[in-house]
């Protein structure tokens, strides 16, 4: 085994839910008129806090799935990432929350509704941090 492989193997990688809250949960974020706003109904898995679940949705539907490469220093994560800016419990429902996520318009290909919807409601629905997920509302800014 090469020294580089040994180092990576000794550090290890934690399987399961990544902690997205530090980068993608931003309750102090003020939405912009140019943001695409989504409201998701989320039911987190046992042990997953609602803020982490909302942040995971924001991450996995924006930049959280991007592969790390040497050019990462050329692209600003803050410019493109989705942000879970508010979480509120659903009245009368146990373990259900509305997670509000803002996406910068620059994240998506100009003029492509398909690209936007694939990112926002694509593979995130199979995410294991959640028992259930549903897109409740979507606001697209005027062109």
UniProtKB/Swiss-Prot annotation:
Sequence positions bearing N6,N6,N6-trimethyllysine: 14
This protein's record includes keyword Plastid: yes
A biological process from GO: photorespiration
Pfam families: RuBisCO_large_N (PF02788)
UniProt cross-references to PANTHER family, sorted A to Z: RIBULOSE BISPHOSPHATE CARBOXYLASE, RIBULOSE BISPHOSPHATE CARBOXYLASE LARGE CHAIN
Signal sequence interval, chain numbering: none
Gene: rbcL
Additional notes on this entry: The basic functional RuBisCO is composed of a large chain homodimer in a 'head-to-tail' conformation. In form I RuBisCO this homodimer is arranged in a barrel-like tetramer with the small subunits forming a tetrameric 'cap' on each end of the 'barrel'.
Catalytic activity from the UniProt record: 2 (2R)-3-phosphoglycerate + 2 H(+) = D-ribulose 1,5-bisphosphate + CO2 + H2O; D-ribulose 1,5-bisphosphate + O2 = 2-phosphoglycolate + (2R)-3-phosphoglycerate + 2 H(+)
A GO cellular component annotation in the UniProt record: chloroplast
GO MF annotations in UniProt: monooxygenase activity; ribulose-bisphosphate carboxylase activity
Function comment: RuBisCO catalyzes two reactions: the carboxylation of D-ribulose 1,5-bisphosphate, the primary event in carbon dioxide fixation, as well as the oxidative fragmentation of the pentose substrate in the photorespiration process. Both reactions occur simultaneously and in competition at the same active site.
Record-linked InterPro entries: RuBisCO, RuBisCO_lsu_fd_N, RuBisCO_lsu_N_sf
Family affiliation: Belongs to the RuBisCO large chain family. Type I subfamily.
Protein name, per record: Ribulose bisphosphate carboxylase large chain
Residue(s) carrying N-acetylproline: 3
Propeptide: 1-2
Compartments where located: Plastid, Chloroplast
């Amino acid at each position: 085994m090469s020294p580089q492989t040994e180092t990576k193997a000794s550090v290890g990688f934690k399987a399961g839910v990544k902690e997205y809250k530090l980068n993608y949960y931003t309750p102090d974020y003020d939405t912009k008129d140019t943001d695409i706003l989504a409201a998701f109904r989320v039911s987190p898995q046992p042990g997953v806090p609602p803020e982490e679940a909302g942040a995971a949705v924001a991450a996995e539907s924006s930049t959280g799935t991007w592969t790390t490469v040497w050019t990462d220093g050329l692209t600003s994560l803050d410019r493109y990432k989705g942000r879970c800016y508010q979480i509120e419990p659903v009245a009368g429902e146990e373990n259900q929350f509305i997670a509000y996520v803002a996406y910068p318009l620059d994240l998506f290909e100009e003029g492509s509704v398909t690209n936007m919807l694939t990112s926002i409601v694509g593979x995130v629905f199979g995410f294991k941090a959640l028992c259930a997920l549903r897109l409740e509302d979507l606001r697209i800014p005027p062109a």
